[in-house]
Amino acid sequence: GLVGSERCIRDRCDVGGFSSRPGAAEVTPEEEWRRVEAGVAAVRRIAPTLPVSVDTFRAEVARRVLETFGPVIVNDISAGEMDPAIVDVVAEYDVPYIAMHMRGTPATMQGMTSYRDVVEEVVSYFRLRAEQLRRCGVRRLIFDPGFGFAKTLEQNYDLLRGLHNLCSLGYPVLAGVSRKSMIYKVLDTTPDRALAGTIALGWECLRQGAAILRVHDVQEAVDTVRIFKAFRP
């Protein structure tokens, strides 16, 4: 789920049909669409008014979702780099677009972690990418720094410490740290036992200015946001 921190607590459901984990099996566009269609349809049956984001980098899948279900948030792990045509689809339908920072592809990204300064390079990337996307007609931008995508453990924490620099660009920032390896490797545990670390890093993301948290444990995240809002009204 996606839990927002701006003004009020807003829940969204993120639906994807393509795993971005390193080593995950390749999925054809048709199979991805089949999975996404089933997922979005299920959400719409259960909660017709709940905002939905669709996790895809493929223009074809994004277009079919928008044609079938109407407006959704498009959540693209490649910020339009893997399938540039997705940018035109987003602009045509004028829907919110989550652009994530990643080098390479999910299959190659872990070998592309050489940065002079990870914070500076991610911020510079989004500063330039924002101009490019806006020129293409994308108006409703959300940035995701891509924790765990083409970053080492140390770089993830460097990026978290400097997250306020990305937030200062003036666009909403989505932070996805839930159950990530940057938590469970430090704690020497497993993803399903990383809730306490997830809450701790989620709080820090909020403190740095993140507008949205991408989470697995929705109620715990909502509680974290509510306490944060009480602490910093």
Give a label for each model feature:
Residues 10-17:
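N-terminal glycine-rich anion-binding loops that anchor highly charged ligand groups
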